[in-house]
Amino acid sequence: MDSRRRSPTVTAKAAAGELPLAPHEGQNQQPSIPRSSDVLPLPLYLANGVFFTLFFSVMYFLLTRWREKIRNATPLHVVTLSELAALASLIASVIYLVSFFGLDFVQSLIYKPNNEGWEIEEEILMVEDSRNGTNCTTLGCAVPPPSVPKIAPVVPQQPSKMVIIEKPAPLITPQNSEEDEDIIKAVVAGKIPSYSLESKLGDCKRAAGIRREALQRITGKSLEGLPLEGFDYASILGQCCEMPVGYVQLPVGIAGPLLLDGREYMLPMATTEGCLVASTNRGCKAILASGGANSVLLRDGMTRAPVVRFGTAKRAAELKFYMEDTQNFETISVVFNKSSRFAKLQSVQCAIAGKNLYIRFSCSTGDAMGMNMVSKGVQNVLEFLQTDYPDMDVLGISGNFCADKKPAAVNWIEGRGKSVVCEAIIKEEIVKTVLKTEVAALIELNMVKNLAGSAIAGALGGFNAHASNIVSAIFIATGQDPAQNVESSQCITMMEAVNDGKDLHISVTMPSIEVGTVGGGTQLASQSACLNLLGVKGASKDSPGANSRLLATIVAGSVLAGELSLMSAISAGQLVRSHMKYNRSSKDITNIASSQLESDS
């Protein structure tokens, strides 16, 4: 605000000996507007003090005179010389104060800050950091400003064996504008934190490009194969990813149609594993030819379990009894449900370990996956309990009794997210013609592999062939959290003979499918398109939570198809042959190695 003490047009060059961070070409420069305080000969603090004192003094004088005229019935328009002087002083002080303080506020709303308006103090701190830095080469920290070496093409050493990968591409850097080049050098030197580029530049794509180039210069490694163009970086700002330098391309295959609950679905699967989409597609074909699959949603509730500590185990038990008392549930629900109109507390489960109490809250979350929603509700309850339990020490909003992104028996038994069971009856003819195996062989293999074999391995929720394959592929395609594949893939696959032993009954039971159709990565363009393909894009307008529940049943139905096909391939001895045919690189490694040796010699 003080133009004589802190000028927004002072450049970094004057402060740190470097070029200023100029705005991108095409951006307008912020005009330098004079202020009333610049024309006064007094120091700024004296000028402000004089006009503040003058304003309040004449205001007090005029109000006093106004009250006296009212008491004496004197006309208000009759003024004395002193009153005229007071009015003039009031107007002058108002003009000064408004021009000094008011214009700054208006200008901050009208004029967008540019790169030259960055705070001089921040640039001085950056210079100090660069002087004090030692061997730090991280993008977000300060490093000494060494001269940037020229990056030569990366050439691998002469190998001793014939197995050679393709020659890496040389480090090709695009032509940057002069102002971008200055910013890149400042990031490399550690004078500008890489994480602040988006907020400073106001252009997410430009920030990603500058960060990418700085990363290449710091590491000496090329990112030529990592695409930068063709992505909306503003869509991930503050939501999906920090400090982006590009995006990874993943192929998306389509399996189906999957006939589930009387409706057909085409399944988008993002994967780099050959045979996975083809195998799932074969399972869908067998299910479709047998009349389809049916699903049942058993539970729908996201959980969060904070951990609190008391001075004694007795005191912790008192809170446990209070939380699990049904008479107190309504009170707790009212406090919890304030977090969102979609949040509805379902249950509270407590566990004690010494003086520590773990409180597992479960609530419905609409069409969102719901982790943030349930966490907000838990925070509300903890603040409410603090009144009656002031000795309660909240150690963490999550105490791993939830349990999130970890294989846990509590999820396997109690469920987390959506609990779904999906089943189908596969006709004997389809088992023979499409799956190329026998019903009896499938049942025996399922028992010795998925049940007995998993038990011998000590599996926790892993009584299946490859549920994780299908879950992760659909999760990535539809913008779910891939890390929650850990508990979402917990599945037990059951097979038995029906209809006098002729047909096969197959089912998958999945107690912890954690999905959502709003929030997180679901709002990205590619992932949103995949959700739209399934008919579950966004929030359900008719019934909150219907889209996320439908997505969970589709995931379970897809797992059913994948389990059916893989188990059939193993039973028929086709697994190795199919993977050798479809899951190997088509590149001739020997020819690549020979050409590589010739080019290097």
Swiss-Prot record:
It catalyses: (R)-mevalonate + 2 NADP(+) + CoA = (3S)-3-hydroxy-3-methylglutaryl-CoA + 2 NADPH + 2 H(+). The chain crosses the membrane at residues 36-58, 86-106. It is a multi-pass membrane protein. Keywords: Endoplasmic reticulum, Glycoprotein, Isoprene biosynthesis, Membrane, NADP, Oxidoreductase, Transmembrane, Transmembrane helix. Its main location: endoplasmic reticulum. One of its GO terms (molecular function) is hydroxymethylglutaryl-CoA reductase (NADPH) activity. The active site is at residues 273, 405, 481, 579. Pathway: Metabolic intermediate biosynthesis; (R)-mevalonate biosynthesis; (R)-mevalonate from acetyl-CoA: step 3/3. Pfam families: HMG-CoA_red. Residues 1-34 are annotated as: Disordered. PROSITE patterns: HMG_COA_REDUCTASE_1, HMG_COA_REDUCTASE_2, HMG_COA_REDUCTASE_3, HMG_COA_REDUCTASE_4. Its EC number is 1.1.1.34. GO terms for biological process: coenzyme A metabolic process; isoprenoid biosynthetic process; sterol biosynthetic process. It is found in: Endoplasmic reticulum membrane. Glycans are attached at residues 337, 583. Residues 107-179 are annotated as: Linker. Belongs to the HMG-CoA reductase family. Catalyzes the synthesis of mevalonate. The specific precursor of all isoprenoid compounds present in plants. This is 3-hydroxy-3-methylglutaryl-coenzyme A reductase.
